Amino acid sequence: MTRGEMKYEGKAKRVYATEQAGEYIVEYKDDATAFNGVKKAQIMGKGEINNAITAHLYPLLEAAGIPTHFLEKLSDREQRVRAVTIVPVEIIVRNVAAGSFSKRLGIEEGTPLPRPVVEYCYKSDALGDPLINTDTAVALGWATEADLARIRELSLQVRDFLVPYFEARGVRLVDFKLEFGKLSSGEIVLADEISPDTCRFWDAQTNEKMDKDRFRRDLGGVEDAYAEMLRRVTQSV
């Protein structure tokens, strides 16, 4: 399979057309951004690690009955995916208070939530990915009520799979962001990635951060944290 025209370039990935109708190649970059692109840097090897983690987890999610766009890992930085139209509504699933949630609501970071909290954001770097509700998404034509119900259902299924998976590997899944897309058939599938870029991972014993917060908060050790997460994700237990 060969890369054709670049269809899209985001903060962390490039998407290319292929000779196969309905399939794209996704290339993972080492570019790191925070605060909706305000802070920028390079994290050496990040693209390879995020590609490897996503390529490991998505087939497991598929086996658990969660449809995804993932088809196969092509190289250290590339994977083959099904072409989707991205729904411009990002989903954040929170298990523990952290980040903007703690600041916005005055809840101490690290406070366990008695049930998962699902938040919706409009996917727009220019606007800072603002929080929205489902009424807004429907009124502005970003998604239908049925789309959003299915997206919520799938998001919680992802959560129910990932929480015990990471617990077994000594990792606390604090929160995570998901993106979904529509196939040409109209089916909604999980797209994008699951990685230290899109999740808050804390060590279960020490609460040490093993994700992009190390970059956001200038904690250092970013490359080592990403490498450790790859080791744990692929660890057999």
UniProtKB/Swiss-Prot annotation:
Enzyme Commission (EC) number: 6.3.2.6
InterPro entries: SAICAR_synt/ADE2_N (IPR028923), SAICAR_synt_PurC (IPR033934), SAICAR_synth (IPR001636), SAICAR_synthetase (IPR050089), SAICAR_synthetase_CS (IPR018236)
GO biological process per UniProt: 'de novo' IMP biosynthetic process; cobalamin biosynthetic process
Taxonomic lineage: Bacteria, Thermotogati, Deinococcota, Deinococci, Deinococcales
Disulfide bonds: none
Catalytic reaction(s) noted: 5-amino-1-(5-phospho-D-ribosyl)imidazole-4-carboxylate + L-aspartate + ATP = (2S)-2-[5-amino-1-(5-phospho-beta-D-ribosyl)imidazole-4-carboxamido]succinate + ADP + phosphate + 2 H(+)
Functional pathway: Purine metabolism; IMP biosynthesis via de novo pathway; 5-amino-1-(5-phospho-D-ribosyl)imidazole-4-carboxamide from 5-amino-1-(5-phospho-D-ribosyl)imidazole-4-carboxylate: step 1/2
Species this chain originates from: Deinococcus deserti (strain DSM 17065 / CIP 109153 / LMG 22923 / VCD115)
Keywords, sorted A to Z: ATP-binding, Ligase, Nucleotide-binding, Purine biosynthesis
CDD domains for this protein: SAICAR_synt_PurC
Molecular function, one GO term: ATP binding
Family affiliation: Belongs to the SAICAR synthetase family.
Protein name as catalogued: Phosphoribosylaminoimidazole-succinocarboxamide synthase
